[in-house]
Regions:
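Catalytic nucleophile loop
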Residues: 103-120
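Non-globular targeting/processing and membrane-anchoring segments
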Residues: 1-105, 122-128, 132, 138-254
Length: 254
């Protein structure tokens, strides 16, 4: 016998209609927040960031691929990783279906990581992806946009991420928390090396030959980009998580 509340169809409908009003309010608030994102002031980018792409060396403006808007997913794949972050990989599984639609709405979607291009290409082939993915190896891009931190920064006890200073334990290795060490092992490294990268997304606009930064989000801010969680939040048991359960799509038994 289930422990969950059981009701009649009429009781379900009454509760569902009450929830529907809350969902509608959330949608209205989401629309308002989307407009506030668009209303943020733009910040001019004068630094000459360089990237390696499948087409060759590229500037930030080149990543727009002839369009006026650029969305970059900061994919956690550091130079010392042997594979991409499994969480970022789960998010990226949804990119290919969106790329063509965005491209036909004047928006380019691109992933950027610090790993050398050859590593990104090999992993991209393994995952069966086709979306654009650029390497920012030897560039300040990831650090400047808050998704790369040195071991020295972590050892200082304070790291700037997600628009705040994070208080961290300099001696933390990940061994104290098996979950953290398990995630690090999944990319072939240890926790201090793994956490030098961080997830996030940034938006840019190109106007009159000038690139402007318009928006960035990190941590739970990328939840909305993680397709499987949008489905799980509507499943009977929700996220129902216990530890590091997700894998790359080619690592499941089914």
């Amino acid at each position: 016998m289930t422990d969950h509340k059981i009701g009649t169809r009429d009781e379900w409908l009454a509760a569902r209609l009450e929830l529907l009003e809350a969902e509608k309010e959330l949608t209205r608030r989401s629309d308002e927040l989307a407009q506030r994102r668009q209303d943020l002031p733009w910040v001019r980018i004068d630094k000459d960031y360089r990237f390696d792409t499948e087409e060759g060396a590229a500037s930030l403006a080149d990543l727009f691929s002839g369009r006026s808007q650029l969305l970059i997913y900061h994919f956690m794949f550091g130079p010392d990783y042997t594979a991409g972050c499994p969480s970022c990989s789960a998010i990226a599984d949804g990119f290919d279906g969106s790329v063509v639609h965005l491209a036909n709405h004047d928006v380019t979607l691109c992933a950027v990581s610090r790993a050398p291009l050859a590593k990104l290409q090999a992993y991209k082939q393994r995952m069966g992806w086709s979306f654009p993915w650029a390497s920012s190896y030897d560039s300040d891009f990831n650090h400047d946009f808050g998704v790369a931190h040195t071991k020295e920064e972590w050892q200082s006890g304070a790291v700037e991420y997600n628009f705040r200073t994070m208080d961290v334990a300099p001696s933390e290795t990940g061994e104290e928390i098996p979950f953290l060490n398990q995630i690090a092992s999944s990319v072939g490294t240890d926790w201090p090396t793994y956490r030098q990268e961080g997830p996030g997304m940034s938006a840019f606009v190109l106007e009159d030959g000038v690139v402007y930064h318009t928006y960035s989000t990190y941590e739970r801010g990328v939840d909305a980009l993680w397709g499987m969680y949008q489905w799980l939040d509507r499943a009977p048991l929700g996220r129902n998580e216990s530890g590091f359960w997700w894998r790359r799509h080619d690592e499941y038994d089914l």
